[in-house]
């Protein structure tokens, strides 16, 4: 049943994002929903293609969430503020000068102590292009927006919306 109905036969499982391409390649899973660079990894390996990107669903969306408990925030107010400020500064840096810092960010993220994926794979979604399948590489200048358009501003209303959607 591929109609998306409630009795559709699909097995949902939890797999850490970096392991998703290898798990699919091994035949343990048949598809996955994940942020980049793991979709691009499937394209590069020739084992899968993205069906749709989050950019096509909701442009300039907050793609990741940094959430802490109220207790932790109250116990660590200075640390909490500093971490949020650091993330906002990093987002500003990534979008500065028409994304001029992205190639440097790709080199940093490709290190094994960070994301550890190949720089070419990370660059595909960080530097204004996206490869939907082998040979179908498209210009998508705002595929990843980190600060422009207030994309990652910590709006309370966004947090509430996400929580209500997860509860459904």
Regions found by a protein language model. Give the residues of each.
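Solvent-exposed loop/turn segments at secondary-structure junctions
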Residues: 19-20, 37-40, 56-59, 72-73, ...
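Small-molecule pocket liners
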Residues: 48, 62-71
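A conserved hydrophobic position in a structured secondary element of the catalytic/binding core
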Residues: 34, 68, 75
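Secondary-structure end/capping motifs
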Residues: 75-168
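Short helix-initiation/N-cap motifs at beta->coil->alpha
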Residues: 2-26, 37
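Alpha-to-beta junction loops
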Residues: 25-34, 46-48
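Ligand-binding "clamshell"
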Residues: 41-55
